[in-house]
A protein has these predicted regions:
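Structural and coupling elements of P-loop NTPases
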Residues: 1-204
Length: 204
């Protein structure tokens, strides 16, 4: 988590096995907040004996297995509006209810700045919370043009200078090779993530 923070990466925590017999989910959430800070706030909460999850951001209604959906929603709103002075003024002085659409941009900003670390509860075994997690990633997670760009350098040692990566398919390729493996039939294979440009089958 610290390494991700140092690199300016957005962070999201997934708590799996919420339906395990020995699961103490309130304690898990407390431990996460103690380890990584008060920025760790649930986007959903287990409900119906961990057979499903209840949304605490888009549609904060219903009962959960622990904690209060309304209080959790309030904590999320308070955390998100702190990064946007204009929105905070509107929220505090006028007491207006903020729609999720108004919170989308400051939510992404809070993620980029490390001011919010969402916690999502799921069960890979039963599928509880999986669809909701995918919805969160689609609707709230920054895409490459919205997130913090990777920190790249051109050159080595004292001569290295920063290079600003732009997620543009038309520019020259900038990629990060994160693993090299050897296949006895194919030979050496490099696994990489493209940050800029386009790579095709016949790229040199």
């Amino acid at each position: 988590m610290q390494r991700a923070a140092e690199r300016g990466l957005c962070r999201l925590i997934i708590v799996n096995r919420i339906d395990a017999e020995d699961a103490d989910l309130p304690a898990v959430l407390t431990q996460l907040q103690q380890a990584f800070g008060k920025e760790c706030l649930p986007l959903n909460l287990p409900a119906a004996n961990a057979s499903r999850v209840v949304d605490c951001f888009f549609n904060p209604s219903g009962d959960s297995d622990f904690s209060s959906v309304a209080a959790t929603h309030q904590a999320l709103i308070d955390q998100v509006v702190e990064v946007n002075e204009e929105l905070m003024t509107l929220y505090l002085e006028q007491g207006e209810e903020l729609a999720p659409e108004q919170l989308h941009t400051p939510f992404e900003q809070a993620l980029r700045e490390g001011h919010l670390i969402p916690v999502c509860f799921v069960s890979a075994r039963s599928g509880a919370g999986v669809a909701e997690l995918l919805d969160v990633l689609v609707r709230l997670a920054p895409n490459p043009t919205e997130g913090n760009p990777p920190r790249c350098l051109i050159g080595e040692g004292d001569k290295a200078v920063p290079y600003a990566v732009v997620p543009d398919a038309g520019r020259h390729v900038v990629a990060h090779v994160f693993k090299v493996i050897f296949d006895p039939f194919v030979g050496k294979l490099a696994l990489f993530r493209i940050h800029q440009g386009t790579v095709t089958r016949d790229s040199q």
